[in-house]
């Protein structure tokens, strides 16, 4: 008979007690009271945080936006067709965050960073909260480096610096997106990572933009975030913050980034829709009271960081659509007051054939001139003045029949200066050649060339400089000034090219 040894049994029991681990999973759950129009009212979820992600039984994710006494208002980030009254909701304990890293470059994603380009999963190295505090005053440095758009009218008269926020505003179909895409194309080889955020646009329009970027090799340094018109309002509301988070990740690594929000009017409309469905009180134009904060907290994240933080930058180009040129509407005035200047595109100029249709009179850049290169400063001052005088004289000349010779000369010069600012889409011009064409225009070298031949002349002059006088481009690029050597080369090139030019 086997003898039972109590000490052995007690040691085995003691061992098992020591190894026993009781784990209790406590889930914060609630019940759906009502669902519809992309909003769910949930009872329970006692300890839910503002903007916390919640998960429904069918896998749909939502954000808890309204925390009320007896229920929680949740915005759905999906169709939510499987959600019904009485179904269970689970709080995740997480605030919305997105995967970021080098792997996202060249991809097309939705507002939650899910790939929509058919190229498989994104293997990101880090995550970043959608809503991050903007850098403080001490962490910033004043804007001091130029961000060249490749558009002569902007780089000369409304210069943009790295870390600036410059609004692009205008009616529909005035070329706002074209200006933004040209700016992305011009960043090739400039070591700038671009993020294009498409909000509430047709999927076909976004596909067109992606194709242009791919064809011109710009997708190698660009990320496209798309919340299409068919997507839920919650995704259209979140998309700009996703774009800002991606750019912020690179900015804090000491890199330069450019973010385009196309456009914030549609984001404000999506937010208005959500707010009204959540029964928040409407204000002016039925927008909620915090619509200013919606845009200010987004745009304040754009910054030029100080050297201690790596000197990275995030430049924001928000786009806002106006109705019949009314810049005094609610959203346009809000965004104008938040940004560091605006580029106003006019439908009248667009229809008159002046493209890009930039109205230089009411467009301003409040901090960009500090970032403009010296060569451009040398020629742009005269251009601004002569164009302003031309606009004034043109209005006056409509009523006067006989004009003196000086006035006629000034009008003729103004017409030629307008011609050099015209530029086809998707053809950004390097800054040294912009300087050359403005120099030729403001110093009278185009005065004897017919107005209709000016575009052909300046395009030919740029090619001639690139092929026959490459040392001019090198001199301006290296010194960033139009010094005596560069000016002599330029004068020589203009004279040589003009001698062989036929209109």
Swiss-Prot record:
EC identifiers of the protein: 7.1.2.2
Record key words, sorted: ATP synthesis, ATP-binding, CF(1), Hydrogen ion transport, Ion transport, Membrane, Nucleotide-binding, Thylakoid, Translocase, Transport
Pfam families in the cross-refs: ATP-synt_ab, ATP-synt_ab_C, ATP-synt_ab_N
Membrane topology: Peripheral membrane protein
Main localization (coarse): membrane
Site keyed Required for activity: positions: 364
Subcellular location: Cellular thylakoid membrane
GO cellular component, one term: plasma membrane-derived thylakoid membrane
Any one Gene Ontology molecular-function term assigned to this protein's record: proton-transporting ATP synthase activity, rotational mechanism
Reaction catalysis annotation: ATP + H2O + 4 H(+)(in) = ADP + phosphate + 5 H(+)(out)
Chain residues that bind ATP: 171-178
Top EC group: translocase
Subunit note: F-type ATPases have 2 components, CF(1) - the catalytic core - and CF(0) - the membrane proton channel. CF(1) has five subunits: alpha(3), beta(3), gamma(1), delta(1), epsilon(1). CF(0) has four main subunits: a(1), b(1), b'(1) and c(9-12).
NCBIfam families registered for this protein in UniProt: atpA (TIGR00962), PRK13343.1 (NF009884)
Family, as annotated: Belongs to the ATPase alpha/beta chains family.
Function description: Produces ATP from ADP in the presence of a proton gradient across the membrane. The alpha chain is a regulatory subunit.
Identification of the protein by name: ATP synthase subunit alpha
Species of the source: Synechococcus sp. (strain PCC 6716)
Gene (name only): atpA
